[in-house]
């Protein structure tokens, strides 16, 4: 500082000699001293608050940015919670849909079992009808009770088939509702996945912003450390200036004492006056220096407070950053878990859909086989109906022949009755003749007894007459027996033909009803097959659209 003072002081006109003491004032004026000692301090003082102001403003900006980022992060966290809740709801809906699908599959199995049991009962009824037909063909008497039981079984099987159809329609409706419910659940899961993707993108952006904020905070820390270093340098320079100033004042006082001793009193007075003036100026300068020092200390306190606040804010920002980083890591782990669970669910869903599709294809194959079997059964029933019609035609012909034979037998019976009546009339005539002959014989006997003359008949004539009467009686009895036997046989044949005709008509009606029911069941099964195939096709299209 002495060198600076010597450079800035104006040179004296006289030349300096060896051994001569410099009696010039160290400062020309208080203003020069203030300008000398205050330039650096004022410049440093002015630059330091500006830098501190800039650093505090940047810290405030960073804090506001951190607050905004934290708010955005909380919003994204809330969205993630909402997405997780929607995902859980979608999973619950999927589990409910799975349960309904299992219930529907169980119901379908029960319907198939009931249908199979109805088909088995139908087969047993058909076998029973065939057995009854065989018994009818072999002439065994009809079992009306067994026919009634078979008819009731057939009616019960038809009722079971109708109930199975109604249950199948209900199952189909519940299946449609379950498919709609499943589609809504899949849509919700897709929306949740999209929300998760959007939120993951936002989380990545926030992680980038947090890394940028971290870099900015690091730069702020470096700037704060630099400011502290500059402040320490400024304080050190001020201390050095104070020491230089003290040494300069001490040297000036020493020089004044030496000058007072060596020089004249006038010169000493002038020097004392100058010294007083300089001391007053020095006091003023000290006062100003003290004020400057106090203001500088105040600014230093303000800067230290601001730096402390900035460090606290930086620490809070670092803590927030750590919490945000841990939250981001946890969210990333949750996202990974969610992705893994979603992939597992998709894989399980695909496997379940494949298994269900294979089961449905097998069920369709079984249904098609059952339909083919029912068609063949319907064709067989039609063939049996045709055979029954042919048998009925033959039975009609037999009944017509029996009717013709009965008419012929009636005609023969009428002829026999006429012959019997003629024989009876002839017998009556013979009896009357015998009576007349006997009366005549008696009258002749009486006349002979009275007149003494006798009419004699030979034994051969009497035997021939007696034999003729017996033969006529035997022939009449024989003809009557043969006619009664023929009438009994004709009545039996007529009753058998009527019974066979009635049984065949009943069997034909039952076969017609059975064929109609078989045709209806085959048509309903075909319609159910078409509906199931259309439902499967629609379901596959929906699955393809959802997968796309």
Swiss-Prot record:
Disulfide cysteine pairs (residue numbers): none
Pfam families, sorted: WEMBL
Cited InterPro entries: Web
Region listing for Disordered, in residue ranges: 430-455
Residue runs in coiled coils: 71-544
Record field: compositional bias (Basic and acidic residues): 430-448
Keyword list, A-Z: Coiled coil
UniProt family annotation: Belongs to the WEB family.
Protein name from the UniProt record: WEB family protein At1g12150
């Amino acid at each position: 500082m002495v060198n600076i003072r010597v450079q800035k002081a104006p040179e004296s006109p006289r030349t300096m000699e060896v051994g001569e003491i410099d009696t010039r004032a160290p400062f020309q004026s208080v203003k020069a001293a203030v300008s000398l000692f205050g330039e650096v301090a004022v410049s440093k003082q002015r630059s330091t608050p500006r830098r501190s102001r800039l650093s505090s403003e940047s810290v405030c900006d960073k804090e506001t940015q951190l607050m905004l980022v934290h708010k955005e992060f909380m919003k994204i966290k809330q969205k993630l919670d909402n997405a997780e809740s929607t995902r859980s709801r979608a999973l619950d809906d999927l589990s409910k849909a799975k349960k309904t699908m299992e219930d529907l599959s169980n119901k379908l199995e029960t319907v198939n079992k009931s249908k199979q049991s109805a088909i088995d009962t139908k087969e047993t009824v058909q076998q029973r009808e065939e057995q009854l037909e065989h018994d009818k063909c072999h002439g065994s008497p009809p079992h009306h009770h067994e026919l009634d039981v078979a008819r009731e079984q057939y009616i019960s099987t038809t009722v079971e088939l109708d109930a199975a159809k109604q249950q199948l329609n209900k199952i189909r409706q519940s299946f449609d509702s379950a498919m709609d419910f499943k589609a809504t659940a899949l849509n919700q899961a897709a929306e949740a996945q999209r929300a998760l993707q959007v939120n993951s993108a936002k989380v990545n952006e926030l992680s980038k912003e947090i890394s940028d904020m971290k870099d900015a905070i690091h730069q702020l820390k470096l700037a704060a450390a630099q400011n502290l270093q500059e402040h320490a340098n400024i304080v050190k320079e001020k201390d050095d200036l104070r020491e230089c100033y003290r040494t300069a004042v001490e040297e000036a006082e020493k020089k004044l004492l030496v000058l007072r001793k060596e020089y004249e009193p006038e010169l000493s007075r002038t020097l004392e006056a100058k010294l007083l003036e300089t001391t007053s100026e020095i006091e003023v300068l000290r006062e100003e220096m003290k004020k400057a020092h106090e203001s500088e200390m105040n600014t230093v306190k303000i800067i230290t407070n601001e730096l402390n606040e900035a460090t606290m804010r930086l620490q809070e920002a670092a803590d927030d950053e750590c919490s945000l980083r841990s939250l981001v890591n946890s969210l990333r782990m949750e996202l990974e878990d969610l992705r893994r669970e979603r992939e597992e669910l998709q894989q399980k869903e695909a496997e379940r859909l494949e298994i269900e599709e294979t089961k449905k294809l097998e069920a369709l194959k079984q249904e098609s086989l059952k339909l083919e079997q029912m068609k063949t059964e319907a064709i067989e029933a039609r063939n049996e109906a045709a055979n029954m019609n042919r048998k009925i035609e033959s039975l009609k012909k037999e009944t017509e022949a029996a009717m013709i034979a009965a008419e012929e037998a009636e005609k023969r019976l009428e002829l026999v009755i006429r012959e019997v009546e003629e024989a009876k009339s002839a017998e009556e005539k013979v009896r009357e003749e015998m009576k007349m002959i006997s009366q005549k014989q008696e009258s002749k006997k009486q006349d002979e007894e009275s007149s003494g003359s006798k009419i004699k008949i030979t034994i051969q004539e009497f035997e021939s007459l007696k034999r003729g009467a017996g033969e006529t009686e035997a022939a009449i009895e024989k003809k009557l027996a043969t006619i009664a036997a023929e009438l009994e046989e004709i009545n039996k044949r007529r009753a058998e033909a009527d019974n066979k005709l009635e049984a065949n008509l009943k069997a034909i009606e039952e076969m017609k009803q059975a064929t109609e029911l078989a045709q209806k069941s085959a048509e309903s099964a075909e319609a159910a097959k078409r509906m199931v195939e259309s439902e499967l096709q629609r379901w596959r299209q929906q699955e393809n659209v959802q997968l796309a």
